[in-house]
């Protein structure tokens, strides 16, 4: 495994770089069957030697600008800021496909093509990564297979239809808890069968090296843009940057723009589900222990014997038992503070943003909005908060309204 080669780079990403073995402190690494060691090393070499050449970057940024619609806007949400700190939203929900996921998906599929792969495979929870990979695969002319837990297929069925419409195959995973963990398990099993002709295009800053580095690097465009936009609009940096954390790709993306700015507080918001005290949550940084899962070392939800535990979140995209190694390192170092928001808080923020600003957020993003609303009241009018609005919420409407519609006055 090699690190980024600075001689080849034309635009070094402002993100955490692991050591030569893929570790961020004690987290990360490569814990996989021996059959995957060489294929993963080949992906790392291709990324290190190709992804930051002028040719690759020109193609990537052509698609970012003309296909994705970057830069995404920075919006001052005055109506929800009333009486507290100014809340700004980085509008990743306005990207093509409706979320931040397209940023790394185009990069991953471009790499797969450079390596001569015939197919990309991926897992998805809420469906946003599945849509983004299927979109990039259609754009670049490569076969695509998406693994999705049966529970999430039912919950996010509009996204399943979109994935199929884009020409990708959806494999419904019915084992275990039928969620994101099982989808990842199935995707890894498929990748293990044929790593020569296909590439696993992982959906977050998780998995064995080089996946966490790759995804974080492609997502760093979010933080770079947000920093420049905030300085332009406010003439200074934000006091706080807030983002939801499941695997952790959107938060790594926006945090990366501010790592060097010690006056800027960074806060990741995990899903507290029914409450951290209930065990029905997906908050490994708050309640997990260090171990190895899905090929890398991280905090993850496990029992006293080290076996993976079930998780719960109203947001499928956050319902994962582990978290990216960069986040584990940032938690231990203290550079990022991690908090949580429960299901009810996220749903309340979902409706508040919809009704106060006319923006329907993804349930995942609503966790960050929920925490920002509380923080805004604590800080006061002279402070500012930047929130990464990582996705839009049309995908969640059927599910949210079926469970919470009556409470919020919506008849269905």
Curated annotation (Swiss-Prot):
Residues the record lists as N6-(pyridoxal phosphate)lysine modifications? 101
If you read the UniProt record, what top EC class would you report for this enzyme, in one word? lyase
Catalyses:
(1S,2R)-1-C-(indol-3-yl)glycerol 3-phosphate + L-serine = D-glyceraldehyde 3-phosphate + L-tryptophan + H2O
Q: What PROSITE patterns has UniProt attached to this entry?
A: TRP_SYNTHASE_BETA (PS00168)
The cellular component terms of Gene Ontology attached to this UniProt record, alphabetical and capped at eight, are: cytoplasm
**GO MF, one annotated term:** tryptophan synthase activity
Keyword annotations for this protein, in alphabetical order, are: Amino-acid biosynthesis, Aromatic amino acid biosynthesis, Lyase, Pyridoxal phosphate, Tryptophan biosynthesis
What's the Enzyme Commission number for this chain?
4.2.1.20
Q: Which InterPro entries match?
A: Trp_synth_b_CS (IPR006653), Trp_synth_beta (IPR006654), Trp_synth_beta/beta-like (IPR023026), TrpB-like_PALP (IPR001926), TrpB-like_PALP_sf (IPR036052)
What cofactor does this protein call for?
A: pyridoxal 5'-phosphate
The pathway this protein participates in, as annotated, is: Amino-acid biosynthesis; L-tryptophan biosynthesis; L-tryptophan from chorismate: step 5/5
Quaternary state and interactors: Tetramer of two alpha and two beta chains.
The UniProt family comment states:
Belongs to the TrpB family.
Protein name per Swiss-Prot or TrEMBL: Tryptophan synthase beta chain
Organism name: Elusimicrobium minutum (strain Pei191)
